[in-house]
Design a protein with these regions (language model features):
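Short, well-ordered junction/capping motifs at the entry into regular secondary structure
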Residues: 249-276, 294-297
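Short, polar loop/linker segments at the starts of domains and inter-domain junctions
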Residues: 7, 17-19, 107-128, 259-265
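Active-site microenvironments of metalloenzymes and redox enzymes
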Residues: 37-41, 107-115, 127-239, 247, ...
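Aromatic- and Gly/Pro-enriched helix-to-coil junctions and flexible linker segments
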Residues: 1-83
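Short aromatic-glycine motifs in intrinsically disordered, low-complexity regions
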Residues: 81-95
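Mature N-terminal segment immediately following signal peptide/propeptide cleavage
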Residues: 92-107
């Protein structure tokens, strides 16, 4: 039911229901609503719902406003399409971005792949444009600059005069401070950041854009798979022999049931590390069943 979906969205979602000016439904109300829907009751035509207005002051700067202030616009890459190392100002941290030349590839897995997931077929052609991808997974060192507001604390401690970019970066919404250590004792320095929502991952990219003046976003599912396959058509970017997997990834049989520091295994042909293991990554778009028509862009 669309009504159920709208009433159970995050409260800061612009489509969130109930009607404007009313409090969210209680757990009891939601239970009754679900029972009502399951019993096949029709929604009265006279009843109208309108989404609750967002409080932009509380929610922080919007993506479109942030990117407009930064002067970003859609279009082809104007600068040289090459790898670079990005420094995060006010910290001693930096990360590498690698250029991924676009092209067409087969997204998904063939039916004869014994390790394929049930949602990985039918395999279908997809085209992707040029893009950049981080050489490594985002580390806690990088992520906590935003999540714990360490970037702002560093500027204040070192009495660094605030710039326009600082103000925009500070306006990006931050998550609620965690109640427990989200590394669960597995280590933080040099380790990949985990346990964030997709929204938090998007907000981090917004903050990183404001902090650096370069446009950052999550990769699409197609871009991620294209980068993972790295121009190959085998089960793994290194071939079909799963016995070689431990040379390229951390997985359940060699990781001692915990994540490991980034970049310790061999990279794939595109120079990207930990694409076959260690931790999962968020992508920009949502899952949709594969289409069978002509290659998608």
């Amino acid at each position: 039911s669309d009504l159920w979906v709208l009433c159970t969205l995050p409260q800061d979602d612009e489509m969130f229901m109930p009607p404007e000016g009313n409090d969210p439904l209680s757990a009891t109300d939601l239970f009754m609503l679900r029972r009502w829907i399951e019993e096949g009751a029709d929604w009265p035509e006279s009843a109208k719902l309108s989404p609750k207005k967002k409080n932009f002051t509380e929610l922080g700067v919007l993506p479109k406003d942030l990117y407009r202030e930064l002067g970003f616009s859609e279009g082809k890459v104007k600068d040289e399409f090459s790898g670079y190392r990005q420094e995060i100002i006010t910290s001693k941290l930096n990360f590498e971005m690698l250029p991924i030349k676009g092209g067409q590839f087969t997204m998904g897995s063939p039916l004869d792949d014994p390790n394929r997931g049930k949602n990985e077929f039918p395999a279908h052609p997809v085209k992707v444009s040029d893009f950049w991808m981080g050489k490594h997974e985002v580390t806690w060192d990088e992520y906590e600059l935003w999540m714990l507001n360490l970037d702002k604390d560093n500027r204040e401690y070192n009495k660094i005069e605030e710039s326009d970019g600082d103000g925009l970066a500070d306006a990006v919404t931050k998550p609620t401070s965690p109640y427990v250590d989200m590394s669960f004792g597995m280590g933080k320095s040099g380790h990949p950041a985990i346990c964030m929502t997709q929204l938090s991952a998007k907000m981090y990219c917004m903050w990183l854009s404001a902090r650096t003046g370069k446009f950052y976003r999550l990769p699409t599912e197609a871009e991620w798979e294209y980068a993972c396959k790295a121009g190959t058509d085998t089960a793994y970017s290194f071939g079909n022999d799963s016995k070689e997997l431990s040379n390229y990834s951390w997985h359940v049989r060699n990781s001692r049931f915990q994540y490991q520091k980034i970049g310790q295994k061999s990279p794939n042909p595109f120079g990207l590390y930990d694409m076959h293991g260690n931790v999962w990554e968020w992508v920009l778009d949502q899952y949709a069943p594969p289409a069978k028509e002509k290659p998608k862009q």
